Amino acid sequence: MTGLDRKKDDEIIEVLRMMAPGTSLREGLDNILLARTGALIVIGDSEKVLSLVDGGFYINKDYTPAHIYELAKMDGAIILSKDLKKILYANALLVPDTSIPTAETGTRHKTADRVAKQTGEVVVSISQRRNIITIYMGSRKYILRETPVILAEANQALQTLEKYKVALVEAINNLNILEIEDIVTLDDVAFVLQRTEMLMRVAAEIERYISELGSEGRLISLQLDELLTNVDADELFIIEDYAIRTDLRSDEILEKLRQLSYDELMNLVNICSILGYSPNADAFEMVISPRGYRLLSKIPRVPVNIIRNLVKKFSNLQGILNASIEELDDVAGIGEVRARIIWDGLRRVQEQIFLDSRKL
């Protein structure tokens, strides 16, 4: 998923949340669906939308599922306010530009598609004959599906995510050992970032399912949160540890990674280039030392500004690991108590890493 795809996905997620099961809007849509009356609903009252309205009734009443259900019995379109609090117009005739191309066949769906493309607003078309709800957003189209179908797909995606998480944990555990022994290669770092991005892209897909499921997606959401614990933070700290380019901040480098297409992500050269390394075969075998952000973040009660001071003082993880309590105490913002906490914390982190390595 590229950055543009991710942005579009975020937009559709917001729309799906508006009409997910358990919401007032979805209740109204489901009532219309059950009554088989069909409907054309525009969400938004911008000047572009109102310029397409011909006739109808100005309602300006609070939105309720019962009100929209009754108004849908009339043939014309219903115009809702952007915040979904008001029903503004009912039985309105929409007159979009007929030169706007559309692949839709039915009159209602053609109008919905053209209005969405012309105004950029969300338009909902409920088919009287096929009994389905179709959402139009700009040039995008999305058909709402039944909850059991979405749940099945979400659970399948969760299984894939669990497999990716196992692979990522193995890669991270391997990186931990290599960092302690100071034998990390660029290839090792790129591989971990690749695995992380693969996992995050499946997670983005599951987030869309959760948005569409609404109140039915609580369990899926809890499972997703558990699987993603520390993944985002670790990815950013890995970039902090290894990126050598100075023209971008770590979060901007992360965004560059997330803009890679799937095929680009599969080529580790692209990841290395984003980190600032020369894209050649020899670079993969280059031994590089982490600055220490990620492993230091595992020590409780050590804020990021203190970690930055440590990195500034000792340059890299090995320098920090080899520092005495007295040397740690000399770092800005670190007193004797915190120096002891950091020194002991690093020892515990190393012990845990060696314990985890035996499970590999």
UniProtKB/Swiss-Prot annotation:
What is the name of the protein in this document?
DNA integrity scanning protein DisA
**Mind listing the UniProt keywords for this protein, alphabetically?**
ATP-binding, DNA damage, DNA repair, DNA-binding, Magnesium, Nucleotide-binding, Nucleotidyltransferase, Transferase
Reaction it catalyzes: 2 ATP = 3',3'-c-di-AMP + 2 diphosphate
Q: Which gene encodes it?
A: disA
A Gene Ontology biological process term: DNA repair
Q: Which family does it belong to?
A: Belongs to the DisA family.
The coiled-coil regions, if any, are none
What would be an example GO MF term here?
ATP binding
